[in-house]
Amino acid sequence: DVVPTLEATVLPATQAGKMTKKTNYKKYSNTSIGWGVSMHADHTTPGGNVPKGVSLKKYQAYYVGNTKEKVMYLTFDCGYEGGYTRKILKTLKKENLKAIFFVTKPFIEENPKLVKKMKKEGHLVGNHTCTHPQLSKCNVAKIRKEINDCAKTMKKLTGYNMDAFIRPPEGVYSLRALKVIKDMGYKTILWSIAYYDYDPQNQPSVDYVVNKFKTYYHKGAIPLLHIVSKADCEALPKIIRLMHS
């Protein structure tokens, strides 16, 4: 499944939050699916954990971008601030690159100036919910509340509308959750490159991170990076140089 170009020309999330039609969501499976990919060292598009016969695209959910071009879509999950965000933003600005930052409500509340900086510097800021729950374990009303309250907090504290992209917490989804998200006007963005980077107390080496990209990069890659990762922060300039080579 190919993501449309990740531009900020999407419906602002504050408008997207209104459901457009009444849907019987009970028709959609609520079985929990943990997102994962089988990365390929031959640089071909990885396979993802999608139920047989299901098209993610039908739900406006994507895990790769344009697979015909040598492009990569940088995405960062922002659960809380670890002291590396400004340096990451500085690197992106220096390289004239844009990313998507998926923010939780607590991240916005604790770092409104950082979120404003992301928007001012041309990045997309997407939704990562209020309390970071597995959405397959939430009823429809709870999913809506998790998403809408996060978007409202961003508008209130930064003055900016949230861009209508979402990353499901922990990468756990269900077809029902994807349908609710789609009906709210959001695109679900998963990932095609990932590794263990989210524990600040157990960080990989910079060489390990760079080697992951060197080994598994593919056209249209959407890597999952974490804002609390010292390794990601320090590896980012090397990753960018690698992609330009």
Question: What spans do the regions from the language model cover?
Answer:
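Structured helix-beta-strand junction loops
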Residues: E95, E121, M184, K219-G220
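Alpha-helical scaffold elements lining the catalytic groove of polysaccharide deacetylases
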Residues: Y84-K87, P133-T158, V172-K219, D232-A235
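Catalytic grooves of carbohydrate-active enzymes
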Residues: Y217-S245
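N-terminal secretory targeting signals
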Residues: D1-K58
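Active-site-proximal beta-strand/loop segments in catalytic clefts of secreted hydrolases
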Residues: F76-G79, F102-P106, T129-C130, R167-G171, ...
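Active-site beta->alpha N-cap acidic-glycine motif
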Residues: G36-C138, K142, E146-K156, Y160-D163, ...
